[in-house]
Amino acid sequence: MQKKITTNITIISCLGLLFYSCSTTKKVPEGEYLFVKNKFIYDKEDPDIKKKKTIINKDLSDYVKQKPAGKFLGFFPLWQWVYNWSPAKFDETFQEYYRQDASVRNQKLLDSLLTKNNLSEYVGHSLWKERLYYSQGEAPVLLDEQQSEFSAKNLNRLFHDKGYFDSKVAVSYDKDSVAKKAETIYDIKLGEPSYIETYDQKISDQKIEEYLNSPIGKQTVLHAGDQYNFDKFEEERDRIIDLLKNRGYYDFNDSGEDLYFEADTLKSNKRLDVTMFIDKYIQDSLKTDSITPFTQYRFGKINIYADSRSFVDDESKLIKEEYKDYNVLYTKEPEYRPRYFTDAFVIRPGQLYRQRQEIQTKRNIFKKENINLHGFRINKQDSILNVDVFFTPKKKYDLNLFVESYASRYMNFAISPGMTLTSRNLFGGGENLETTLKGTLGSVNKDFSMNKAFLNAYEIAIETKLKFPYLLTPINLDNILPKRFTAESAIRMNASTQKNVGLDKTTYGFGFDMDISSSEFQHKVSLFNTEFISNRKKDRYYEVFTKDNNTKNEIKDLYYAYNPNAPIYVTDDELTDAIEADKGFQSSLTGEDAKLYVDFENMLYRKANISQNVLINSFIYQFTFNQENSFRPKSNPWFIQARIELAGNVLRGLDKAFGFNKAEPDREGNQAGLIFGIPYSQFVKFDVDVRRKFKLNSNSSVAGRFLFGIIQPYGNSDVAPFVRSYSAGGANDVRGWAPLTLGPGSKPRIDSKNQSLEFESMKLLFNAEYRFNLFGSLEGAYFLDAGNIWGVNKNRPETLFKFKDFYREFGIGSGLGFRYHIGTFAIVRFDLGYKIYDPSYELGDRWQFDNFNLLKPRIHFGINYPF
């Protein structure tokens, strides 16, 4: 422990020396100051200042122009240090060099600039290190008083928008001429706010006036007595525009002049008479303004060009098919039935224009896998909107090649090449057949395999999925399912086989899925979800899981010491069965030996789960609510996903009706029903995953997650299948632990190099992350994770969830991470996790601060955010 403390102190000391030895003012010119901070000071004598700050509710640093340079992980000015590593004499040369286009930056350009700046002795040198420091570092931010004055005016505009018309912002500076650093201080006096005395509406169009005075239309956010707030005026404007654009007023306020507010301040600038105006001015030939009613539009013709090449001047040359009032046009014999296109359309000929329906139509089109949207044109003709939509079909066949790689505690290295072949439009309605073939070659850790060859394991997997862009149901649901929902169905089959991976599984699967989704909601149902898993090498269990083998051998030694005349059993299973049946031996164990026997029973439970052959036939329903997909994405979006799975009930009914073959009775005399010699699983499983993100400012956010899951076997099953059980630890879990090594509950710790796999029937997990931009596409994060797994089997009381104690059994981990954004959608993640609170220790020793070692984090790699 002393060594760990010394190591941590050494690391912290080195960081401290680095901090003080790398001056951030090294390149600050004489008479200038390094700008280090903006400070905002409100009037302390104002008795209502707390309330006023709450009303403003803004990060003031977003409204000032000059900001201090960023700091690595929020603490270290790393990029300023890197910039200063480049000698100052090269600054002017490098500034001119990087001002040029990248295509002309070469040694010739660099040499000419060095000569120009009297640095001829460096001609011919690439200066790559110095250029790297200069280009990747960050130049010092110098105090700019003009920018500070501009920022003060910007702050005043903010306060004015919040109703403080008499606000005053005074700028001063705290300059340290010795350190060459300065702070800008903004002294803020808000004064008294202004209020809306009266609120009135003047609307020139009678139809719009009647609508805005209806129960829906008059739900205004502006009221007499409210404090003036410009944000509320914008909210009210957007509300009215949204209402009218969804009542046929296609081009309402597109000019920005149809709706406006006026505030009368003649009586007092503290009590305002506010009026909202809606009117449409046009100019006649004499350029005289006159008011005219707004046009309410309906859809006319909707022309769907199935191939963008079909847009020709002479439409008589096209094959035209009318389907449900839509015109579908082709250049040749149709490959797709008209319904494939029209299913996406929420807008219909003759309907009143509604902006939401236009947006939903485009979203539905973008979900179509076989076509690209080439154009969406709306043409006004009096009060009619004619629509032309152009599509480009994708290729009939598409081959996608991919390669994946990974490493784990079990597998030193694995590479997985694969390919997916897509055959589009099999039956003319947009049906696709996807076939994926994937192979894996890997090197199993020597602790888990007797085969010492480098590539000593493989897996081959194939999956076929037939996808339908509609619901496969006995009845037609077109008139029941709203158009804002898109529907899909899929029939899937898969098979895989392993060699020298675990117990060498062979897996077969089949399922029928239906998916109904809108912008925020998704309902997914899996019927006849069937999985068959066969472990071909069950006898290798103790070779693979060496910790369990050690436990078995220790109990074996105790058993033969207790009963020297016991027979020598041929198999390990015969031995463990005999030990389980010997109550006299069990009652003879005390102290550490009794604890060892509990570990032995847990090992047998684990072995039964992992090595069992499994047949699952289940029904699954999953509900997802995701505000990040809404029409107007929220700044603090929610994500909620709930899932329930019911397995074995159909087979149980058939078993009772027809009488399946039965397994040998267990110790309680129960006999499981068999199909092809395998007990079918019967259980109910429920999960809920709740997440929320909070945007703090343009560069940082906080994200949190709560996850709960439970599985309860019953009927034909005593234990839950391993593939449906819960584990804790890993890159998306409690990151201070490796996968499957945390828990269950407060199970005593063992040698981490010999850790058994841990899984159970119940899970609780909490995660929190503070995410912030470092520079460019690189993001940093601090995280805190807490969670564990527990059992629900009363025959194993040491693993049970206990309401009065569960919070003491949370594993708590923390750490920092880096995320690099590749393009728009992909993120490469690297996390360093540390154990903070370890429930495997005795109660008084669970906090791990004394054992904390900065040099030994748990390292995790991942793709995209963990939640």
Regions from the PLM with identified roles:
Residues 2-9:
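Bacterial N-terminal signal peptides that target proteins for export
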Residues 334-335, 354-633, 638, 735-736, ...:
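Gram-negative/organellar outer-membrane beta-barrel architecture
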Residues 18-21:
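C-terminal motif of bacterial Sec signal peptides marking the signal peptidase cleavage site
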Residues 44, 188-192, 203-205, 276-282, ...:
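Flexible glycine-/small-residue-rich
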